[in-house]
C-alpha cells in the first residue's frame, strides 16, 4: 500500500496553483515584444519527444505494475522516450524502494533503448546543496541504464550563479549525460528560472544534452531557443509547457506530462510535422484542448485526469490517483469522452 508522505514538498505540491507569470527581471529591458522577435518555424524537423510516465494504481491504491509495464511498452512503441519517476510518476510521493523498482522495470522493457528518469532530492527551505544525495540518485539511474533528469531542490536553487554552475559541472562530471530542469515557482517553491547568462553557461556543459523549461512563458522559452541556436545548436530545449505544446514548431523538443495520455497521438502529430503535413495543426488543436482541460487548477490533479483518460481508453485497470495527490470529479469523464471522440479520426 502506498503510504502518504508528510514532507514539506509533499504538502506544497498538493496545493500548488498555476498563476500567470508576470514580467520580471529575467526579461531583458531591451526585449522587443513584437512578431519580429518570435523565432521562425523550423519545419520538416524530427522532434525528440519525451513522455513522463504515469504510475498507475490498483483499486486498493497499490502500484499497478502490469499497467506500468504496458504503458512503457506503448510509449516505446510509439517512438517516444519514456521519462519515469517524474512528477507524473509521483516523484515526490514515492519511496526509494518504489523508485528503484520502477527503474528496474523500465530497464528490462527498454532493452537498450533510451529512457530518462528523475533524480529527485527532497529537502527543506534553507537546506544546503546536497551533492551526495544527487550523486546517489544519478548513480542509481545510470546503473539501470537511464539518463538522469536533474530536479531542482531548495539547496540547489539557493546557490549563487557561480556556485550553481559549479554544482551542475560536478553533476556533469558524474554523468555520461543528463537533462537539466528549470521549474517556475508557480509549480514548486524550490523552483527557479535561471538568468539568460546562467542558461548560456549551463548549456555549454558537455554532458548536459538538454534542459526542460517549465516557466509557462513563451517569451522565456523563445529566448532560450535563440541562445541554443547561437551557442550549441545540438542542445535540446525541452518544453515543459503543457499549455503551449506547439512550441515544437519553433525548435523546442518536449518532456511533457500531457503526452502520457496519448503517446500514440503525440507521435503521430510529430511525424506530421516532419512530413510537412498541415494536419499537424488539427491534431495539435485537439491535444492542446486536452491539455487545457487536464492542467486546469489545481494543476497536480492532471495526474488523476490522466488516469481517467487512460482508463477510458482501456489502457489501465483503474482510474484512481495517489491518495496524497488532488483528484478530479467523476463528472470529468463525460467531457473526456467527447475529447476522445474528437481524436477518433487519428486513432
What residues fall within each predicted segment?
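N-terminal polybasic/positive-inside topogenic patches
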Residues: 2, 22-25
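N-terminal cationic leader/targeting segments used for protein routing and processing
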Residues: 7, 16, 25, 29-30
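Active-site beta->alpha loop and helix N-cap motifs at the rims of alpha/beta catalytic domains
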Residues: 31-191
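C-terminal alpha-helical cap/extension of soluble enzyme domains
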Residues: 37-38, 51-54, 79, 252-253, ...
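Catalytic alpha/beta core domains of metabolic enzymes, predominantly
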Residues: 179, 183-299
